């Protein structure tokens, strides 16, 4: 709870207290579980229990285990309003995912993609230079390159469209490209009937 992102939970708790939903689901980076030696998650669970919600132990789930070709691990916290729980209710069990070997990056790629998504020579050269620099330092940081046969991409974040380094797609005979907004939506589990109401640049 050291910055604005950390205090956001208290806004969530305030909304839950005011609206009393039958159920809720919260998602965060998996590192939350060990943040501040586990004290942060203890505070969160304590507050949710004080709101009179049944909250089972949070679980870390990976999108790739649920049919999405993205290696995205997140801690999931669910809660159920005790006023609506059945009398014979025992406990909630999180779904158990599995690896589907048929799932691959090609599943989310669009057939036709505009040239504007191909990164410039300058950006591509910069990515490669930083990759070489990180390699000399002995770490694996730098851009990540994938193709249609890759099993999954790395995790994409809100900053993806700054340079696309988290997940670039190989192209024959030219620089790699960034994912389109539709492809990003598919990686987040949205079906194609989900409307992206803004331009490519803003989305």
What are these regions (language model features)?
Residues 148, 157-158, 162-171, 179:
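Internal anion-binding site segments
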Residues 1-155, 159-161:
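Class I S-adenosyl-L-methionine
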Residues 167-170, 174-202:
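FAD-binding beta-loop-beta segment adjacent to the flavin cofactor pocket
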């Amino acid at each position: 709870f050291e910055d604005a992102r950390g205090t956001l939970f208290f806004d969530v708790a305030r909304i839950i207290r005011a609206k009393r939903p039958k159920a809720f689901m919260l998602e965060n980076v998996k590192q939350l579980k060990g943040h501040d030696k586990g004290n942060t998650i203890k505070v969160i669970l304590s507050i949710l229990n004080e709101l009179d919600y049944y909250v089972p132990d949070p679980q870390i789930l990976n999108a790739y285990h649920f049919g999405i070709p993205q290696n995205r691990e997140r801690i999931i916290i669910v809660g159920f309003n005790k006023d609506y729980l059945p009398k014979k209710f025992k406990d909630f069990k999180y779904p158990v995912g599995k690896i589907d070997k048929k799932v691959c990056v090609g599943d989310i790629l669009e057939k036709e993609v505009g040239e504007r998504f191909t990164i410039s020579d300058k950006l591509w050269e910069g990515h490669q230079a930083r990759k070489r620099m990180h390699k000399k330092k002995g770490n694996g940081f730098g851009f990540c390159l994938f193709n249609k046969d890759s099993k999954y991409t790395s995790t994409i974040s809100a900053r993806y469209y700054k340079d696309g380094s988290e997940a670039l797609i190989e192209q024959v005979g030219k620089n790699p490209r960034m994912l389109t907004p539709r492809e990003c939506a598919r990686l987040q589990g949205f079906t194609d009937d989900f409307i992206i109401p803004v331009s490519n640049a803003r989305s």
